[in-house]
């Protein structure tokens, strides 16, 4: 991008010139995305006119909520007109703070995974305790069930995943089990619907992974990338972030009961980390197991594993699925 263009845009935000820039172009077809890191202080973000002033204002308020609990997050800047967005040809642009810390994915071999995981999980508990039912967004998080997230079409992602699992079971001649899985899912969702509107929720970053977690000296310090931010029911958020996984090693070496019990134990251990910072109310205590049931049977990585494991050892995988739906 031409330096004069950058200087002109930055001047609208009260930033006078720059000495260094790094351009990151992640454009995909018609989806134009250009980020320009300026002097490791600012990020100029240019994309299609899909981002709105209201959405950026909501993200900026969320950033302050994270900072309030001791988690760094990039603030947004307003231009001289008092707006976050500025026009740039056929696109729009805005400016965010640059946080000069390494990403976790860059330091994974130098950090203790369990330490970072637990620090991140504790921050989830702190955020939920501090911000529940405060300044909620109309946009739902990608974890959402019942209400749809922006990328959902007709059904939420977990229902879509479950439908894929059911289709695979039927294709293997396991029609009875497929119907049982559907009934299990429907019953859990029906119980959640009865409580749904009264469950505490808050706005979350919504896409925690090693590519947007910042670390310093082996510890979690902050988050970037709030494009997937949205409102989420706290206990659903907790279950999704503590899903863990049935590892290939466990699946290969242990029987179905051991695999399932190990998975359950790991999930509870990680959930307990969140709950060291957050106390469930009575309604959440009633709902959390049904959210966990839905996560186990229909989160994307789980369904992909089940489909693969059905190919490797159908009998063992069916036993695991039956443990899930009988629990």
Which residue ranges define each predicted feature?
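Juxta-kinase regulatory segment immediately upstream of eukaryotic protein kinase catalytic domains
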Residues: 1-20
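An alpha-helical support segment within catalytic cores of ATP-dependent transferases
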Residues: 2, 6, 136, 157-205
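ATP-binding pocket architecture of kinase catalytic cores
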Residues: 40-136
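A cross-family kinase active-site recognition segment
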Residues: 111-173
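All-alpha amphipathic helical-bundle segments outside canonical DNA-binding/catalytic cores
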Residues: 281-292
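Helical subdomain adjoining the active site within ATP-dependent kinase catalytic cores
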Residues: 302-327
């Amino acid at each position: 991008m031409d330096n004069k263009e950058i200087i002109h845009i930055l001047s609208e935000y009260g930033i006078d010139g720059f000495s260094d820039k790094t351009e990151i172009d992640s454009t995909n077809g018609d989806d134009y995305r250009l980020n320009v890191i300026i002097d490791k202080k600012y990020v100029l973000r240019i994309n299609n006119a899909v981002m709105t002033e209201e959405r950026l204002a909501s993200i900026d308020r969320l950033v302050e909520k994270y900072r309030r609990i001791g988690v760094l997050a990039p603030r947004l800047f307003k231009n001289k007109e008092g707006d976050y967005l500025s026009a740039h040809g056929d696109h729009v642009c805005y400016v965010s703070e640059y946080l000069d810390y390494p990403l976790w994915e860059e330091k994974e071999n130098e950090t203790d995974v369990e330490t970072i995981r637990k620090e991140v999980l504790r921050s989830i508990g702190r955020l939920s305790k501090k911000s529940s039912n405060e300044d909620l967004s109309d946009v739902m998080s990608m974890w959402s069930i019942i209400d749809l997230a922006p990328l959902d079409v007709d059904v939420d992602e977990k229902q879509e995943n479950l439908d894929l699992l059911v289709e695979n079971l039927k294709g293997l001649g396991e029609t009875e089990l497929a119907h049982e899985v559907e009934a299990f899912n429907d019953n859990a969702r029906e119980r959640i619907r009865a409580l749904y509107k009264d469950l505490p929720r808050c706005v979350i970053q919504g896409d925690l992974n090693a590519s947007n977690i910042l670390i310093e000296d082996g510890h979690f310090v902050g988050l970037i990338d709030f494009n997937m931010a949205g409102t989420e029911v706290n206990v659903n958020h907790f279950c999704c972030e503590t899903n863990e996984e049935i590892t290939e090693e466990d699946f290969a070496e242990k029987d179905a009961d051991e695999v399932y019990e190990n998975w359950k134990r790991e999930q509870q251990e990680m959930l307990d980390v969140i709950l060291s910072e957050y106390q469930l109310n009575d309604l959440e205590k009633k709902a959390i197991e049904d959210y966990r049931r839905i996560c186990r049977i229909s989160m994307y990585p789980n369904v992909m594993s089940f489909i693969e494991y059905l190919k490797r050892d159908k009998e063992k995988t069916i036993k695991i699925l039956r443990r899930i739906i009988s629990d």
